[in-house]
Amino acid sequence: MNLYLHPKLWPQLAGTKTLHVADAQRVRKITVHDGIWDAELPRAKRNHSYHLRYHGSSYSRCFLERYRCKTIGVFRRSNQPDCLETRSEKAKNRDGVVQEKSVRTLFSECVNQCDIRRRPTRFLRMFYHQKHFQLGLKGTETEKNERRL
């Protein structure tokens, strides 16, 4: 499934497992923290990625940022809003040298973990089109189908 991911969808998709929801550059993960929405774009090198970042709701203030990180997606129920926790983790590299890595853990209330586990592609496709339709965005398959009817 290769979908264009509109930035207006980022808050709704924040913290979800988005391996099957992608824009032209195959967005790997979306996070939100302190009003900043991140979409992770995979790179060829291991543990390298580009992040397309939107501050607030202004599309004109977007920029690309590259940094090294190891990302782990975790779904938990909590009273806290969507957040991103960063912590250090020690691990041995190929040469046997112990190094510290930055691990970013996602916490999200917006998605049921069971729905994603059972049918991630189908669930995210439905979720994606539902949000597109609610926001009235142009150029979506949902809108084209509505016109036909």
From Swiss-Prot:
Function: May function as an early signal that helps mediate the activation of T-cells.
Protein name per UniProt: Early lymphoid activation gene protein
Tissue spec: Expressed in heart, kidney, lung, and skeletal muscle, with lower levels in pancreas and liver.
Protein source organism: Homo sapiens
GO biological process terms, semicolon-separated: signal transduction
Gene: DIAPH2-AS1
Tree of life domain: Eukaryota
